Amino acid sequence: MKKYLITSPELYTQEPQSFEAILRRILTEHTPEYAVYRDKQNPKYKELAKIFVQVCREFAGLCCLLHSDAALACELGADGVHLTSAQLEAIPHAKHSGLFVILSTHTDEEITHAIALGADAVTFSPIFPSPNKGEPKGVEALCEVVAKNPIKVFALGGIVEPWHVEAIAKSGAYGFASIRFFVD
């Protein structure tokens, strides 16, 4: 099962040197196959995105993504972009630009649209209780989504314990995505 690391400014900081050190340590310790730089409010987003891509390049086989900004992902040489569910219509442009595309989804309808528009993978969330993310969908709903949709599905939301990962593995999901699971 694939591991997908999502950064958070609260846990990785917005200070370039600290960000780089924390990122490198976590990538070394957890060896995820996918990683996305996500910081919706940072005025230094481009500066830290550049550091993120450079550090990710040190880890062979790591698929490096930026959150929401396909143009910047292309400019900095990232492998892909993680789009929000509100950015569904941006999938074709991102794919045309040669990017690997993951879309955040919360419903079957969003997954169906993501597939139709050519997304490579989706996150489906929240699976477990997660701060400010609404009612958890649960592992049973994840199993249903995985069984009926021909796309890579990453479980997301509230994944903080090894037993969460074990439950997701049994669902047949392609992988799991998390912020807090990877932080000590």
Q: Each PLM stretch: what is its role?
A:
Residues 46-68, 85-107, 135-160:
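Alpha-helix-loop-beta-strand connector modules within alpha/beta enzyme cores
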Residues 34-36, 65, 82, 102, ...:
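Conserved beta-strand positions in the central sheet of alpha/beta enzyme cores
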Residues 1-21, 99-105, 154-155, 160:
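Active-site mouth loops of central-metabolism enzymes
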Residues 100, 104-130:
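Histidine/lysine/aspartate-rich catalytic loop segments that bind and position anionic ligands
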Residues 64-79, 90, 106-118, 146-178, ...:
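Catalytic cores of alpha/beta
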Residues 5-11, 84-93, 121-136, 158-184:
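Glycine-rich phosphate-binding active-site loops on the catalytic face of alpha/beta enzymes
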Residues 34-45, 126-132:
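Glycine-rich, proline-tolerant flexible connector loops at the mouths of alpha/beta enzymes
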Residues 22-31, 53-59, 74, 93-96, ...:
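Acidic (Asp/Glu)-rich catalytic clusters
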